[in-house]
Amino acid sequence: MCIRDRNSWKPLWVVDFPLFEKENDQYFSLHHPFTSPHPNDIELLNSKPENIRSLGYDIVMNGYELGGGSIRIHDRKIQENIFNILGISKDEAKEKFGFLLDAFKYGAPPHGGMAFGFDRIVMLLAGSNQIRDVIAFPKTTSATSLMDNSPSNVDKAQQDELGLDIKSN
C-alpha cells in the first residue's frame, strides 16, 4: 500500500483552466471576466469559447490550494469580446467598466496577480488539516463567532448610535 509521507512537500501548479463554463446556453467566467485567454486560443473567441484555456493558475501543496491568480486582459477588443460572450451588453460594460475600457485606449502592459492564503500555509506548516486550528478568531461551522457571539441582534440604542433604521418584513 502506498501511504503519503506527511513530511514531504509536494507542490504543483494547476494551469490551463477553461476560460468559461457553460450552463443553460450561457457562458460564465470560470475565474473572473478579466482573465486573459491563452494566446494560442484567441481565434476560438468567435467560434468555440468553451474550448478556450485561460491564463489562470493555482498553486497547490499536498492537495491544498495555497493561492491563485491570473494574467489579466490588457487589450480593449479582447475585453469587449469577453463581455459579449458573457452576455454583458455594450451599455452595461460601459456603465460598469467604462473606466477600464477607456484606460485601454492609452495602452496597458501585460500584467497579472496572485494571492496566497497565508492561513493555509500556516495550517500546513503546523501539520494540521483544519484551517480553524490556525485562524486567530475562527467561526463555528454555523458561522458564529465564539469571541463576540456574532452575528447577533443589534439593540435599539446601538441602532440609534449608528444611525440605522432596520425595518422588518
How would you label these PLM feature ranges?
Residues R4-N169:
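Structured aminoacyl-transfer and RNA-binding surfaces used for tRNA recognition/handling
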